[in-house]
Amino acid sequence: MTEAMKITLSTQPADARWGEKATYSINNDGITLHLNGADDLGLIQRAARKIDGLGIKHVQLSGEGWDADRCWAFWQGYKAPKGTRKVEWPDLDDAQRQELDNRLMIIDWVRDTINAPAEELGPSQLAQRAVDLISNVAGDRVTYRITKGEDLREQGYMGLHTVGRGSERSPVLLALDYNPTGDKEAPVYACLVGKGITFDSGGYSIKQTAFMDSMKSDMGGAATVTGALAFAITRGLNKRVKLFLCCADNLISGNAFKLGDIITYRNGKKVEVMNTDAEGRLVLADGLIDASAQKPELIIDAATLTGAAKTALGNDYHALFSFDDALAGRLLASASQENEPFWRLPLAEFHRSQLPSNFAELNNTGSAAYPAGASTAAGFLSHFVENYQQGWLHIDCSATYRKAPVEQWSAGATGLGVRTIANLLTA
């Protein structure tokens, strides 16, 4: 193992020879990051990405000024999907070190799970990984049920079964119950619902290669809410929370669903399929029906749902939708506290009616007359939330994954959103 490169922090500007905009400098003792007080966490993350780009794979965070947030900012920029890296962490107090260790364990799990090839991570594997993570932090306070394949059809989970039946790998619903109270009759405080499409070809509405090559990450919503629950537990979550992961492949085969098919859901809604690549909302609907049946105070669903959200926000923000202004404000406050990027996009009553069908109550995609794709997708989901005007948040996870590296992130998953949702659950 090579000797560690020392990384220190300074509030003084770099020597003029490095240029007036220099964020780091190099000397015989190692590398100094020059903080300016404007965006210190972002500066540290961007510098870490540059340090990794220099091929430095063993570092020691040394000297004064390091805390859990600054260490984490460094790791977010330093971590990448290829190769190995070693960080020697500075001395932190017990609480800060525990917080950092929990982030490293759980959010790295989220990033690594999203980055996993679809060949390795099918619907069953995703569900089991989620169970293993939550069980690791919750112990005997968690129970779960896995329903798959034809059992889904027999039990009325028609959206999930319809989307997933075209794959040889059976679709799976994970229903997990975290109940720290020990009381089987305890009310459910919150339900988390995640889209777990482990590979999305688009189905018969097939994607072009440029839009399909990152679709191993289409289970990013499921990974995010799983990580959020695990992280909230490490922060002392003492309320009952249920997790529903809707896991499937969306592939083409002789048994795959087709345009013009009509899906009848357990709540009586009939949906005409006019785009098999708008499959995420079809599987989430089943999870939202189950979540609503629990009568929780709070329902949060997370999904890499629309390209429209990415068009609006790029990969820099998660898109937030809600009819509940107070709840949306609480989520945005949590995001601010955790230094994670969320941006609220419009969701109005009229978006719920912008999915007309000639043959069913709903179409699974908006027509050219209604181009607000992210908002109409949220409007679609609202039809499966019993009390959609209160207590429901929809997160379109546009900041989950990057196809190419940028100055602060490597290519691949980011893990953004985990801490914000956990913060809201424990507030």
Swiss-Prot record:
Chain segments annotated as transmembrane: none
Superkingdom, taxonomy of origin: Bacteria
Cofactor binding description: Binds 2 manganese ions per subunit.
Molecular function GO terms recorded: manganese ion binding; metalloaminopeptidase activity
GO annotations of cellular component type: cytoplasm
Keywords for the protein's UniProt record, in alphabetical order: Aminopeptidase, Cytoplasm, Hydrolase, Manganese, Metal-binding, Protease
Annotated residues for binding of Mn(2+) 2: 195, 200, 218, 279
Active site: 207, 281
Main subcellular localisation: cytoplasm
Name of the protein described by the UniProt record: Peptidase B
